[in-house]
Structures are given as structure tokens and as C-alpha cells.
Swiss-Prot record:
The protein's name: NADH-ubiquinone oxidoreductase chain 4L
Role: Core subunit of the mitochondrial membrane respiratory chain NADH dehydrogenase (Complex I) which catalyzes electron transfer from NADH through the respiratory chain, using ubiquinone as an electron acceptor. Part of the enzyme membrane arm which is embedded in the lipid bilayer and involved in proton translocation.
Gene Ontology CC: mitochondrial inner membrane; respiratory chain complex I
E.C. numbers: 7.1.1.2
Gene it is expressed from: MT-ND4L
Gene Ontology terms describing biological process: ATP synthesis coupled electron transport
Gene3D superfamilies: 1.10.287.3510
Subunit structure as annotated in this protein's UniProt entry: Core subunit of respiratory chain NADH dehydrogenase (Complex I) which is composed of 45 different subunits.
Organism (species): Dactylopsila trivirgata
Compartments, record wording: Mitochondrion inner membrane
PANTHER family: NADH-UBIQUINONE OXIDOREDUCTASE CHAIN 4L (PTHR11434:SF0), NADH-UBIQUINONE OXIDOREDUCTASE SUBUNIT ND4L (PTHR11434)
Amino acid sequence: MTSINLNLTMAFSLALTGVLVYRSHLMSTLLCLEGMMLSLFILMALLISHSHMFSVSMAPLILLVFSACEAGVGLALLVKISTNYGNDYVQNLNLLQC
């Protein structure tokens, strides 16, 4: 395993650990999820370019699009929770009335 792959794997595992540790605050969880998605994007792009599998070269771009959609929905939920309750605790998610 090269050092770049090792660093990206460690970045993904640190972001996953951050999600598990800071799961009570929505903002911290969203930042850690973005870190996970960014490390997955870079790892996929490097592996595809290294192995010359250009038939799946759209996969990192699709992952990036889904990551942007996830960030948009997460930030909208964060704004809704923070304006209604004044904090970003995840425990407030079950209190939202749709």
C-alpha cells in the first residue's frame, strides 16, 4: 500500500471516528461526513487513474454529486433545527414535525 493510499485510508477512518465521537452535534457530524466523502472521492479518482479503468471514470463525479446533495440537505436540516431550537443537538431530530 502506497503512502497516499495509506494517508487517505487513515483520513477516512479518522473522519469515521469523528462521526462516532461527535454524534450528538449535527454540525460536527456533517463536517466528518464531508471529510469521509472527500477522502473516498480522492481515493476513487486515484485508483481509477492508476489502474487505467476509464470505463468507470464517472464514479468519482457521481459520488461528488451525491456528496453535494447530502451536504445541502444536511445544512438545510441544520438551519431548521437551529432556528427552531437554538442548538444543533441530534436529539432534536425526532422532535421535527413535518
